[in-house]
Amino acid sequence: MIQFLVAAPCSGSGKTTLTCALLAALKRQGQDPCSFKSGPDYIDPMFHRAVLGVESHNLDLFFSAPETVRALYAQAAAGHGAAVCEGAMGFYDGLGGVSDTASAWHLADTLGLPVLLVVQPRGASLTLAAQINGLKQFRTPSHLAGILLNDCAPHLYALLAPMLERETGLTVLGYLPHLPDAALESRHLGLKTAGEIADLQQKISRMADALVMDWEKLFALTEGAAPLVHTDRLPPAGELPPQGAEEQRPRVPIAVARDAAFCFTYAETLEALERAGAELCWFSPLQDSALPEQIGGLYLPGGYPELYAGQLSANRSMLASVRRAVERGLPTVAECGGFLYLGQSLEDANGERWPMAGVLPGQGFRVGRLVRFGYAALTAHADSMLFRAGERLPVHEFHHWDSTDNGTGFTAAKPNGKQWDCGFANEHFYAGFPHLYWAGTALPRRFVDAAAHYHQEEQDQ
């Protein structure tokens, strides 16, 4: 099985572009690749999914223990001919930017993956070799196995490749030339989402066409035994229903928002909910007039509601449907953008304020910079639908908007010690800015149990 991780010295080097080009080329060759993303990012996996037509998975060593990450990787890679993981940020950049914990290197070390280093030869030549050697020597083993040059002219590649191999001892495997017609646009949370780029498939095809690669060398460096799937670890124990429970009750319908405004979901979270007994019912707060009928729960994930605030506000029937359902006690989870949607109002990118569902007291407003960005540990103050008092869960925040009332149900603490209160929770509700990673936790089981109880009560009336 072909397995490798794509990394770079820093963000903006072209990891996503190279990863998409490699995935598309491997798919053309019939390798049936699957893909992964290190860290908590939602957007890059959307591009992987656009290339492959199947889900991409996040692997995060802050969210999950090493054995859980290995199990998730093995499960998702099973049956595929190639597994390609895209690293996050710089190769060694982990918690708080001052640790290699949860970095791309940490993931490569945990999974034993060879690493292909993406380098952009902008204004440097021999100095690139010095930088690469520094990365090689910084940790042992570095797992660096090969070099890919991005945004590189053919004549420059012919000059740099033999020099880099001589000076670093690494194999230079290929390059992607300058492709202005295939550039992926960005905005405040990173790249625009895959669904917003109308000609994305043409761009992906252009990348794959232009990719120059020594495939024989790549396969020699990256081919190895497929990871073993440890069935006793999949799904993690916290997600397992009681023995025979699946036969005792039918699947519980849970409405999940999915459209341009609500698109930040982890594949592992959705899979964990399904393993816990949920039937996922997709709906669009932008387009649909009401929630799906006869549901037992509601999941409002993050996304970009601030970019669609006017359209969301204009869909009054959906806002009323959500408000009635939550006030009736429908088990509900709302993360980040979903949390803003449940507030009183939301300011859009132009500064105009729009009425929202009105379930929560806060008003969402634009800050213009990242707010409380990064990893944190969430500690519950009291028992609720998802949490038990004193329970801690690793979470992530990534937003340029804030609320006038973030709640006080939890304490969030960053690795650097900074703390703040946040979140709303009761016996049928969770809402807050933190993004939750559900795989390997008790959350899926608790949410589905609450949804099943509510669904049964509704049917009995």
Model regions: which residues?
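C-terminal and late-domain segments of enzyme folds
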Residues: 108, 262-274, 279-281, 366, ...
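Phosphate-binding active sites in nucleotide-utilizing proteins
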Residues: 250-316, 320-327
